[in-house]
Amino acid sequence: MANITDFRDFQAFKACRVFTREIGLLIRSVPLRRNRSLVDQMERASISVLSNFAEGFERDGNAEFTRFLSFCKGSVGELRAQPIYCVDIELIEQERYEALDLMAETAARLLGGLTRYLKTSNKAGRKYVRRSQPIPKRRRRMSVKGRA
C-alpha cells in the first residue's frame, strides 16, 4: 500500500465501483423505478459506498481510513440485502440477484482485507509521514486598515 497515492488505485475501490455501477443500472430498470423509496435508498447507499472510501482515504490517517471503510462495508451490506427484497417481490430475477451478490461479496471481502491490513500495519498513514523538509509557514495577510 505504500505506493498508493490515489484511492482509485485500490482493488477494493475498483470492486466497489463495479458493484455500485451494477446497482445503478438495476435501479434504472423499469419495474424498479416504480418503487421510488427503494430506488432512493439504494442510490443513497451506492453513493455512500464510494464516498466513504474516498473520504476515509483523503483523511490520511489509517485509523480514520479504517473507520470509513467500516461505513463503506456497511453500505455494501445494505446493498447486498436490498436485491433480496427485489427478488422476493418479483422485481428482479434470481440470476441477476446472484450476479449482484457475487459482486457485493467480492467488494466486502476486499474491504475486509484492506481493513485488516490497515489495523495490523505498523505505518500510521500518510498524515503522519515525516517530511524531509519542513512545511513552510503561512504568510500573514497584511492589514489594509486606513485604506478606503
Would you name each region that the model predicts?
Residues 1-148:
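Amphipathic alpha-helical assembly/interaction segments
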